[in-house]
């Protein structure tokens, strides 16, 4: 994919973003591209910025076309097998599909074999704006095409399954929010401290957030840099999707980045200093997000791409909505009674009870992921939430003061 150059131009309104296997197509129409045989053209930046809000994997879509031409077709043609497209169309699975705006219409997959490959690759690796939106849905919707994509992209599905099982096991055994009970009722128990003092942490500003990096992680500079880079990406998306006034409040939440805290094998939001004291941890982490294991944070990004937003939603609910309100309680009660969240598709293809049903914190955080980003459980994106539970969708929007 890195062999495909990207041309960022300015002001040309006639052309959006597209892969051009031959630059002559551009020059013949009086464009002035760089002297390259092929490229992705992003000709009008404003349009690209607008389109990428609902199509966050838009550039990847065009890179897939580049991969199709360069690798599969060996720079002579688009190489994706026509038979793959014909089988998919004959199956009847791509006649009508839910789109990002909660409306059903003919999906772009049906346009031709190149678009089928690009659209389904978006879902395979990221988030598409047309159903199937994510990998789990693609696997359930069209398992044959799913396997063909894995082969075309040389993906180790067995390794992916092992990683997914490890994440599912970690989520079941290690809560993403810690200290809720202690925050509610208080506790005077404490254990002997066994942690590096705050003064030993390196501090940096990432997208406006105060980030503290543990001394052990600092000893692994490559890992630390990868974690910072991913965190920058995650926080950038929070800023891009969440309303500006709410972002200002979210930036008050510190983020602690550790190499390997055995008490936090993934991520957590520390709701109580009492809970931290009871296990001998640093009470300065109270009210903050902790990425307790940098390796796991990097490892599981593809399955939980909005996990940082999830963490920050806990902080927002605690500080701005007093841990919940009547609207949220009503929505949660209605969701529990409806049964629609009792057995939903999860990132690993399993059907499980939605973690949103646990309490108001989980309900708000999970569905904020869905509303602004991509969840790891159905409903995966806002369009599905709006279709499945429109009342809750409006409540989540209102709590974030979103338009």
Task: Locate each region found by the language model.
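Acidic/His-rich structured neighborhood in mature extracellular/periplasmic domains
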Residues: 1-90, 199, 207, 214, ...
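Short loop/turn segments at secondary-structure transitions that flank enzyme active sites
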Residues: 12, 72, 124, 128, ...
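Metalloprotease/metallohydrolase-associated module, dominated by Zn2+-dependent proteases
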Residues: 24-37, 43, 53, 85-169, ...
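A general structural signal for short secondary-structure junctions and capping/turn motifs
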Residues: 107-109, 202-203, 245-248, 354-355
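Short acidic, Pro/Gly- and aromatic-enriched capping/linker segments at domain boundaries
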Residues: 188-203
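Terminal transmembrane helix and immediately flanking juxtamembrane interfaces
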Residues: 212-219
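A short interface-forming secondary-structure element
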Residues: 220-224
């Amino acid at each position: 994919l890195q062999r495909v150059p990207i041309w960022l131009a300015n002001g040309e309104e006639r052309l959006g973003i597209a892969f051009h296997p031959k630059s002559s197509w551009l020059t013949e129409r009086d464009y002035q591209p760089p002297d390259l045989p092929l490229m992705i053209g992003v000709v009008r930046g404003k349009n690209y910025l607008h389109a990428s809000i609902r199509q966050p994997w838009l550039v990847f879509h065009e890179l897939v076309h580049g991969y199709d031409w360069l690798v599969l077709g060996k720079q002579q043609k688009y190489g994706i097998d026509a038979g793959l497209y014909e089988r998919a169309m004959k199956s009847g699975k791509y006649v009508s599909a839910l789109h990002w705006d909660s409306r059903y219409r003919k999906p772009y997959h049906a346009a031709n074999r190149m678009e089928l490959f690009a659209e389904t690759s978006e879902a395979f690796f990221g988030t598409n704006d047309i159903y199937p939106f994510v990998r789990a849905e693609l696997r359930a919707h069209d398992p044959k095409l799913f396997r063909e994509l894995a082969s075309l992209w040389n993906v180790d599905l067995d390794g992916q399954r092992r990683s997914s099982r490890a994440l599912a096991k970690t989520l079941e055994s290690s809560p993403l929010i810690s200290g809720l009970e202690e925050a509610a009722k208080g506790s005077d128990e404490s254990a002997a401290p066994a942690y590096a003092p705050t003064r030993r942490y390196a501090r940096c500003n990432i997208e406006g957030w105060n980030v503290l990096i543990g001394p052990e992680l600092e000893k692994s500079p490559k890992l630390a840099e990868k974690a910072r880079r991913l965190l920058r990406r995650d926080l950038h998306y929070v800023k891009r999707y969440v309303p500006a006034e709410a972002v200002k409040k979210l930036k008050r939440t510190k983020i602690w980045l550790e190499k390997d805290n055995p008490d936090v094998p993934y991520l957590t939001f520390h709701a109580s200093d009492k809970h931290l004291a009871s296990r001998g941890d640093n009470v300065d982490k109270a009210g903050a997000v902790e990425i307790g294991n940098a390796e796991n944070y990097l490892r599981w990004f593809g399955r939980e791409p909005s996990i940082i937003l999830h963490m920050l939603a806990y902080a927002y609910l605690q500080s701005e909505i007093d841990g919940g309100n009547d609207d949220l309680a009503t929505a949660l009660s209605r969701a529990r009674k409806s049964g629609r969240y009792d057995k939903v598709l999860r990132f690993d293809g399993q059907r499980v009870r939605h973690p949103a049903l646990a309490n108001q914190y989980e309900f708000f955080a999970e569905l904020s992921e869905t509303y602004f980003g991509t969840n790891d459980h159905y409903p995966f994106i806002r369009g599905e939430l709006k279709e499945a539970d429109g009342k809750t969708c409006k409540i989540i929007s209102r709590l974030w003061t979103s338009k």
